[in-house]
């Protein structure tokens, strides 16, 4: 099974369980491989959603390993501060605060005002999606105040 077929199977499992597939990531940390499946849904993802989808994907991976060697499967929400790696991530993040690094090293930070024809408008700047090296949403934690 190739990566595209595997992604389609995972996407179908996620969508059949009322969630959307946000991203799939293979990483190595501390000498361990991780196959991460990030899911979203309106109102937020619950621990039960993650466990259910993990339990449906796991038997498939027992038959068809997604990577060579030992790995850990994780299913989770992408979180409040999440990577933006696809055009649809930008489209769904309009109105949120983002940090972007372009291919030439320029750093932009501000509200994602629009994403039209693969061009992100961040504050007063515009940047083409193909010129983005990395991007993520962020939260300004000091703007939240606890009131008794």
Curated annotation (Swiss-Prot):
Keyword Cytoplasm: yes
Subcellular compartments: Cytoplasm
Keywords: Cytoplasm, Ribosome biogenesis
Keyword Cytoplasm: yes
GO CC annotation, single: cytosol
Name of a matching Pfam family: DUF150_C
Principal cellular location given in the protein's record: cytoplasm
Residue stretches spanning the membrane: none
Biological process per Gene Ontology, one example term: ribosomal small subunit assembly
Alphabetized SUPFAM superfamilies for the sequence: YhbC-like, C-terminal domain, YhbC-like, N-terminal domain
HAMAP family per record: RimP
PANTHER family documented for this protein: RIBOSOME MATURATION FACTOR RIMP
Job description of the protein: Required for maturation of 30S ribosomal subunits.
UniProt similarity note: Belongs to the RimP family.
UniProt protein name: Ribosome maturation factor RimP
Organism field: Nautilia profundicola (strain ATCC BAA-1463 / DSM 18972 / AmH)
Classification of source organism: Bacteria, Pseudomonadati, Campylobacterota, Epsilonproteobacteria, Nautiliales
